[in-house]
Every structure is written in structure tokens, then in C-alpha cells.
């Protein structure tokens, strides 16, 4: 990796810092520090995503992220999954989705997470309120379909990562203490079962911006 400095014309560390802070849509606070990793070994509340740097086309690239789940390593997820996690948790300025109807850009997001249980099924419902615009032909006429397509993509991504990696992209576990006290007390004893027993549902509410 250090050999790439000659190709880049600058130190790899400086290049990566520029990519993460000035080019990427991901906010700086999304990336954990050494201190936050140690802190989570005690707190065991957060799911953190650490960029895994490789070389692509002779330049450093991040295509996967290590997962640090409640103070323990939990394997790797691809960059798309990490991007959704950052956007869900208000740690991304703009989130782009390439859909059949066009390129959907979502920004200015806030989210609301609620917890429910019915007939033994526990759900975490994530409602994302955001601004949206479409790049491509026919986008304006398909706004309703685009919103549903975005929901479907997010729900499939969250379900796949939860089932295959036992990782929750929403960061909902850390909210249990204030929003679902009964769940919190239960999962303090068996937190390893949380991702297996809770279904995540995304709802996307878009305030459309029509570009001239």
C-alpha cells in the first residue's frame, strides 16, 4: 500500500484523508477512532464500520468495511451496505441510488426509529425523511414508483446483511434503552440474538426537488 505514494504523488494517508473528508459524501464523524473502538469494548451499544483499504487501478480504494459490533469484530460488509448504514444514521450528506427510472439522489435526511411487537414478531421501523431529486428521463412522472423502489432496495439490503452477517445497519440497538426498555433489559442478557429476532422495515418519505 505504501508503494502507491509514488504513483499518487503524495502520501497514501494524505490521499485517503482527502478522499474521506473532501470528496466522499460520508461525514467525517461516521468513521470510528481508536478511542471509540476501545470505548465500545466497554459500552457494547454501537455497530461501527471501518473502511478496508485495498488497491484498485493503482489507487487506494474502499470497497468493503470491517464491522465492529458492540465491542467485537463481526466480519465484513460491502461498501453499499455501509453507505446505507451511514445514510440511515444521518452520517452521509447525500445518498445516490441507480434505479431503472433514473439516478435518485437523497439528501438532508433525518430518521425516526420505532419499535413494535405483534404476534411474537418484533419490528424496527425506520422512517427516513429526506429531500430527493432524479437524474434521468421520466423521473418526475415516476416519483411515487421511485420512492417505493428506494424502500424496496433498502429493505432487501438490510435483510440480507442482517441474515447473512447478523449486522443491523440502522444502529437501532443503541436506542433500546430509551425507546424500548423491555427489549433493552432482555437483550442485555442475550444481545447476540438481537439481529436474528428483529425485522427491520424502511419507510422513505421524500420531499421532491424538481431540477430545471
Regions found by a protein language model. Give the residues of each.
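A glycine-rich, acidic short-motif signal
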Residues: 1-212
Amino acid at each position: 500500500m505504501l508503494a502507491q505514494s509514488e504513483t499518487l504523488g503524495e502520501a497514501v494517508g494524505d490521499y485517503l484523508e482527502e478522499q474521506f473528508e473532501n470528496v466522499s459524501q460520508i461525514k467525517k464523524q461516521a468513521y470510528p477512532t481508536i478511542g471509540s473502538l476501545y470505548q465500545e469494548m466497554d459500552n457494547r451499544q454501537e455497530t461501527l464500520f471501518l473502511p478496508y483499504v485495498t488497491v484498485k487501478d493503482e489507487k487506494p480504494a474502499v470497497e468493503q468495511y470491517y464491522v465492529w459490533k458492540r465491542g467485537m469484530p463481526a466480519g465484513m460488509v460491502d461498501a453499499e451496505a455501509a453507505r446505507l448504514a451511514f445514510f440511515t444514521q444521518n452520517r452521509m450528506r447525500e445518498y445516490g441510488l441507480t434505479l431503472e427510472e433514473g439516478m435518485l439522489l437523497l439528501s438532508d435526511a433525518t430518521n425516526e426509529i420505532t419499535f413494535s411487537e405483534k404476534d411474537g414478531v418484533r419490528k424496527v421501523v425506520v422512517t427516513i425523511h429526506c429531500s430527493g431529486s432524479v437524474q434521468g428521463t421520466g423521473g418526475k412522472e415516476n416519483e411515487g414508483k421511485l420512492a417505493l423502489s428506494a424502500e424496496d432496495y433498502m429493505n432487501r439490503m438490510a435483510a440480507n446483511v442482517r441474515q447473512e452477517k447478523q449486522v443491523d445497519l440502522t444502529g437501532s440497538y443503541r436506542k433500546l434503552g430509551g425507546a424500548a426498555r423491555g427489549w433493552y433489559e432482555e437483550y442485555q442478557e442475550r444481545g447476540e440474538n438481537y439481529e436474528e429476532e428483529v425485522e427491520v422495515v424502511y419507510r422513505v418519505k421524500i420531499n421532491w426537488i424538481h431540477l430545471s
